[in-house]
UniProtKB/Swiss-Prot annotation:
Record function comment: Nuclease that specifically cleaves and resolves four-way DNA Holliday junctions into linear duplex products.
Database matches in Pfam families: Pox_A22 (PF04848)
Keywords carried by this UniProt record: DNA damage, DNA recombination, DNA repair, Hydrolase, Magnesium, Nuclease
Gene Ontology molecular function terms on file: crossover junction DNA endonuclease activity; four-way junction DNA binding; magnesium ion binding
The protein's name in its UniProt record: Holliday junction resolvase
Any one biological process term the GO annotation gives: DNA recombination
Family of this protein: Belongs to the RuvC family. Poxviruses-type subfamily.
Cofactor: Mg(2+)
Enzyme Commission code: 3.1.-.-
Free-text remark on how the cofactor is bound: Binds 1 Mg(2+) ion per subunit.
């Protein structure tokens, strides 16, 4: 199953692509990308999110009045009559200040990325600003960890 998790934004969106093998319960990071949706954002969003033909797209819930909410509605509509499931989840990290949540996200990303790819150093050297890719990575990983917990619960 191909999972695309997205850190929504106009200037600095990022997305992580995972391959989740539910027979062996293994997760592999296929790609992690940053983009720019400032010009012709609808086309850019559609291009980025269909590049890897995902089975599931994970989006982080936005505030009611957030300008990024329109992107969520666009993505849900874009995939409405398709085989791609769109899931909107609460943020991975809660509480504390915005700055502390971003730091926590980056720390967890740096700690865990090598478990899912052999290209940790390439990724860390490619991006100077890690918070967006860290958020997309952690959002996808959080979703897959919840799938694994459900599998373990149902097997007992």
């Amino acid at each position: 199953m191909i999972i695309c998790s997205v850190d929504i934004g106009i200037k600095n969106p990022a997305y992580a692509i995972f391959n989740y093998d539910n027979t062996s319960n293994t997760i592999k990071l296929i790609a992690i990308e940053k983009s720019d949706w400032t010009k012709n954002w609808e086309r850019s969003v559609a291009r980025d999110l269909t590049r890897y033909n995902p089975d599931v797209v994970i989006l982080e819930k936005q505030g009611f009045k957030s300008p990024n909410s329109k992107i969520i509605y666009f993505i849900k509509g874009f995939f409405y009559n398709s085989n791609t499931k769109v899931i909107v989840r609460n943020p991975t990290f809660k509480g504390g200040s915005y700055r502390n949540r971003k730091k926590q996200s980056i720390d967890v990303f740096i700690q865990k990325i090598s478990e899912y790819t052999d290209y940790k150093n390439d990724i860390l050297n490619k991006y100077t600003k890690l918070d967006d890719i860290a958020d997309s990575f952690n959002l996808g990983l959080s979703y897959m960890e919840s799938l694994l917990k459900k599998c373990k619960i149902s097997k007992d």
